[in-house]
């Protein structure tokens, strides 16, 4: 993998309360033709972190730029929380308080370990179809991770560490 400078947050697109493990996702990804789980970390409903794909191997979690050298898979950490759909199967922020706390802690740790310049939701990597300079909700390829990552995880680029944005 190239130098890590981004974190991409995903959801498993499973209904609230349906727990999965990293091994479950690994099996699902292999069934889709992957050679292993695409995410580097999985955050279960109870807030437990499970490791997925090694950070020494290119990810397989965000292919919006294709297989080019600029692909997020080449320079980002993929974090997936279990959930993302409500009881009716509609996109929703279903993170438990434990998942939220664990995600904030993991992002903070990754920002300290790597020179992270951006923390994005998978949907934020969709193409800017209207050329406005901002990917708007109407341009999202998918709703994943079903919450606004940019507002929750603002970064000070001079000192990469998550902070609250008002």
Give the label of every model feature segment.
Residues 2-118, 133:
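Active-site-adjacent loop/helix surface patches within enzyme catalytic domains
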Residues 117-126:
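Acidic carboxylate-rich catalytic motifs and surrounding loops in phosphoryl-/glycosyl-chemistry enzymes
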Residues 129-136:
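Acidic, glycine-anchored loop motifs typical of Ca2+
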Residues 157-166:
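Single conserved hydrophobic/aromatic residue that forms the stacking wall/gate
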């Amino acid at each position: 993998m190239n130098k890590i400078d981004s974190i991409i947050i995903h959801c498993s697109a499973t209904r609230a309360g349906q727990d999965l493990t990293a091994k479950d996702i690994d099996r699902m990804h292999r069934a889709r033709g992957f050679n292993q789980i695409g995410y580097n970390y999985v955050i279960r409903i109870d807030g437990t972190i499970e490791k997925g794909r090694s950070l020494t191997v290119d990810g397989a979690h965000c292919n919006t730029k294709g297989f080019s050298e600029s692909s997020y898979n080449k320079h980002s950490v993929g974090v997936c929380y279990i959930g993302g759909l409500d009881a009716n199967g509609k996109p929703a922020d279903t993170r438990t308080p434990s998942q939220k706390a664990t995600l904030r802690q993991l992002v903070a740790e990754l920002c300290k370990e790597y020179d992270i310049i951006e923390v994005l939701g998978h949907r934020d990597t969709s193409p800017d179809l209207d050329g406005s300079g901002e990917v708007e909700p109407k341009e999202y390829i998918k709703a994943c991770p079903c919450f606004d990552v940019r507002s929750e995880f603002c970064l000070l680029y001079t000192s990469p560490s998550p902070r609250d944005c008002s």
